[in-house]
């Protein structure tokens, strides 16, 4: 069974998939429409007595899946669990989970001084400590972790081929996650450092945008990963005129290139 089919079954996602006829990033990039942007939840802190959370700009507060408030001004306060709820600026009694979400793109969130895209979740644990996770789009997550991984200049076709494999490997990791965990991956294990590290000068953000939501679907699975591609002198292939698709086809036979166009996640709906 092919990788993508495994991902679909294992994650219980409803996806709409279309073929990608020519993977060449030098072509004009056409943004794909999405029903729901694919997201990932990253564990930032598994157990802490307190943490500093700041919302700059308007934000929404959800408690156990219920909208509690919409604030037009930001807030910077310590968050901690109490015996009967969670306190962040004010006390929210009876809650197990507090979600803080920016209202629009002008707003931003900080956890212990580090800026993150997306939303922050604060869970109250049985020992009255808190667990904090960040829900962010998969594309923004990749921009963060790969911006500090690819710190050497590569031809854009070579880099885009690597990005496609990195994205595919991430979906494999999502498939292998423990379904009992609210989060998908741990920040400290993945080198996830939020939004601030994304502003590098090696074309990673552009390559992720050019190949947005594009993965390889191979009967053999990931027989070579992005690191293996780099060790195979992928930059030389790009300089010789191979585009991203042609580069990957040299290593993968009978491979399909698919774009994830929509994602309706059914897991953990009662927690959100």
UniProtKB/Swiss-Prot annotation:
Annotated source species: Chlamydia pneumoniae (Chlamydophila pneumoniae)
Annotated Pfam families: SpoIID
Name used for this protein in its record: Uncharacterized protein CPn_0389/CP_0366/CPj0389/CpB0400
Highest taxon of source: Bacteria
Family: Belongs to the chlamydial CPn_0389/CT_041/TC_0311 family.
């Amino acid at each position: 069974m092919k990788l993508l089919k495994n991902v679909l079954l294992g994650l219980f996602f409803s996806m709409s998939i279309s073929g990608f006829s020519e993977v060449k990033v030098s072509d004009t990039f056409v943004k794909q429409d999405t029903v729901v942007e694919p997201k990932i939840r990253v564990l930032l802190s598994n157990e802490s007595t307190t943490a500093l959370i700041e919302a700059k700009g308007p934000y929404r507060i959800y408690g156990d899946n219920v909208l509690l408030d919409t604030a037009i001004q930001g807030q910077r306060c310590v968050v901690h669990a109490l015996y009967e709820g969670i306190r962040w600026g004010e006390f929210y009694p009876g809650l197990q989970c507090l979600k803080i979400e920016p209202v629009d793109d002008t707003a931003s969130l900080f956890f212990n001084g580090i800026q993150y895209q997306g939303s922050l979740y604060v869970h109250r644990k049985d020992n009255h400590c808190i667990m904090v996770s960040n829900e962010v789009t998969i594309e923004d997550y990749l921009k963060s972790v790969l911006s500090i991984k690819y710190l050497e200049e590569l031809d854009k076709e070579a880099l885009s081929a690597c990005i496609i494999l990195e994205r595919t490997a991430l979906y494999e990791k999502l498939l292998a996650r423990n379904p009992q965990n609210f989060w998908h991956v741990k920040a400290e294990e993945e080198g996830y450092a939020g939004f601030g590290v994304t502003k590098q000068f090696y074309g990673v953000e552009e390559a992720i945008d050019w190949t947005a939501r594009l993965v390889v679907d191979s009967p053999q699975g990931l027989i070579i990963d992005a690191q293996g591609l780099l060790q195979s002198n992928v930059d030389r292939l790009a300089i010789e005129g191979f585009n991203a698709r042609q580069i990957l086809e040299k290593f993968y036979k009978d491979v399909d290139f698919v774009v994830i166009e929509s994602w309706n996640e059914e897991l953990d709906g009662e927690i959100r």
